[in-house]
Amino acid sequence: MSIEKQVAEQLLEIKAVFLKPNEPFTWASGIKSPIYCDNRLTLGFPKVRQFIAKSLAEKIKENFGEVDVVAGTATAGIPHAAWVSDLLDLPMVYVRSKAKEHGKGNQIEGPLTKGQKVVVIEDLISTGGSSLKAVEALEEAGAEVLGIAAIFTYGLDKGKKLLEESNTKLVTLTNYDELIEVALNKNYVTTEDMATLKEWKKNPEVWGK
């Protein structure tokens, strides 16, 4: 079984991903969605989080072999970045969404030297906006960002466009299309639900309005 399918299956099993085509969730961005992904739940399942860390480490070795530092995004990316940096025997930093308003006022915590090559660890990619803020902060600090490694992506056109425009490479363990196929095969959703799930991805901003 592929990594994509294995991770999708695990996320469904531990209920890190909820699929409710008939009772959509509302994201913080206001988008109505038949899916909600909370990868923080992986923290409570040692076998799942270990598999995710090992798989992310392998992806990084394959795609970003020159990496010097692993950077987690606050807060959900931090634990995964810690486990991955351990496996790769690399330093780790983490990046806040904005600089602290007290203390040293740091946006990046941990030692980072100009010119170091960094890979950003994310738990989830939706529109890509928050991930790119982390990339920008690292670049402003003088780092060279090789790319982003994430557990899951919705694969939305808006996110793809933002990443392409910023010339940021993204590698993920699994994705929306793979996950809904696994969900159908494992009877988490019906064939009718699948039509709704596929329709949402075509135009999430207007779906459900």
From Swiss-Prot:
Keywords: Glycosyltransferase, Magnesium, Pyrimidine biosynthesis, Transferase
Source organism, top-level taxon: Bacteria
Biological processes, Gene Ontology terms: 'de novo' UMP biosynthetic process; pyrimidine nucleobase biosynthetic process
Annotated catalysed reactions: orotidine 5'-phosphate + diphosphate = orotate + 5-phospho-alpha-D-ribose 1-diphosphate
EC number(s) reported in the record: 2.4.2.10
UniProt cofactor(s): Mg(2+)
Binding sites annotated in the UniProt record for 5-phospho-alpha-D-ribose 1-diphosphate: R96, K100, H102, E122, D123, L124, I125, S126, T127, G128, G129, S130
Keyword Magnesium appears in the UniProt entry: yes
Keyword Repressor: no
GO molecular function, one term: orotate phosphoribosyltransferase activity
Family from the record: Belongs to the purine/pyrimidine phosphoribosyltransferase family. PyrE subfamily.
Assembly with partners or alone: Homodimer.
Protein name as catalogued: Orotate phosphoribosyltransferase
Gene name as annotated: pyrE
